[in-house]
Amino acid sequence: MNLHEYQAKQLFAEFGLPVPEGYACDTPQEAFEAAGRISTAKKVVKCQVHAGGRGKAGGVELHDTKEGVKAFAQKWLGKNLVTYQTDANGQPVSKILVEEASNIANELYLGAVVDRSTRRIVFMASTEGGVEIEKVAEETPELIHKAAIDPLVGPQAYQGRELAFKLGLQGDQIKQFVKIFMGLGEMFAQYDLALLEINPLVITAEGNLLCLDGKINIDSNAMYRQPKLRQMHDASQEDAREAHAAKWELNYVALDGNVGCMVNGAGLAMGTMDIVNLHGGKPANFLDVGGGATKERVAEAFKIILSDTNVKAVLVNIFGGIVRCDMIAEGIIGAVKEVGVSVPVVVRLEGTNAELGRKVLAESGLDIIAAVSLTDAAQKVVAAAEGK
């Protein structure tokens, strides 16, 4: 689950991190009043969406007057912001962040992720702030400095000092950086984060550090024990189909093709998408129904796939390991009857009771196309999607 910038900054402030004075506003009038409470001559106004590239898309502006801030809010609230990280429809803007402008002398980067190779939280810091860290990692990896956190003792001040020295910080800036580092380390563990970024972490003209932007991603598997963060969830920023799938514990990601895919197992799902693409098709989605592919979940999966009007055919690819293929076949039959599937459905079953499953499908009387192999399934579903 992602948080908005204003929500990330609220958490930063709770842990003693320096953030600009700012207010999240729902209406143009609120934005106008917020601008009046901010003492700096210039105000920064930012559209709040779960996507990067807001500035280049016109979603971040600097204004001298309260009227300018209000006009920005009137322009964007209730509209969609399209950036290089969104699809063609963009993301809806329901809040505007109005905050004080800062005199920036230098921009740094500070972030943390769960590193699977070391099985630890790893902090990354760089002097190349304000740009995509992925680009820095690819072109100049020597400019990224790391600190791995021992889970038994947590973040240590000496690690913060080492990073500060490598960033070229001096005097009181080192103390400020260590405080930020320690606060982020505590917050990362306490709130079950998967990723956090401050980009940029700026040095102001006065020589102080300030968290100018914030990005936080929470481990969705830990949401059951994070009631406070659950309340921060903004469903409007998610694809409606993906949100519905999550309620049924289905792993669904919308794509832009015309071949719907329903598979059990993430690895098999990715392989299925690859082979569909190899045979000239374009997957419309990634959908992993998991090990418990019951009739109800299969029916919901069909509903989700078919809610995409671009889908011209559906490929169901099931490996019967934990589940029996005959049970899956019965679930598919029930789901097809319940949902009223109007596009060709290709089914490939392998594993436990696969032969029995294929027999159940053949005797169902439904227009279901059976496939004997993954290649056969891909060829048949691509042909069906093309109307052949």
From Swiss-Prot:
Gene Ontology annotations for the cellular component aspect, listed alphabetically: cytosol; succinate-CoA ligase complex
The entry's keywords: ATP-binding, Ligase, Magnesium, Metal-binding, Nucleotide-binding, Tricarboxylic acid cycle
Protein role: Succinyl-CoA synthetase functions in the citric acid cycle (TCA), coupling the hydrolysis of succinyl-CoA to the synthesis of either ATP or GTP and thus represents the only step of substrate-level phosphorylation in the TCA. The beta subunit provides nucleotide specificity of the enzyme and binds the substrate succinate, while the binding sites for coenzyme A and phosphate are found in the alpha subunit.
EC number: 6.2.1.5
NCBIfam families: PRK00696.1, sucCoAbeta
A Gene Ontology BP annotation from the UniProt entry: succinyl-CoA metabolic process
Name of the molecule in the record: Succinate--CoA ligase [ADP-forming] subunit beta
Binding residues for Mg(2+): 199, 213
Coiled-coil regions, chain positions: none
Superkingdom of origin: Bacteria
Primary enzyme class: ligase
Record bears the keyword Ion transport: no
Family label: Belongs to the succinate/malate CoA ligase beta subunit family.
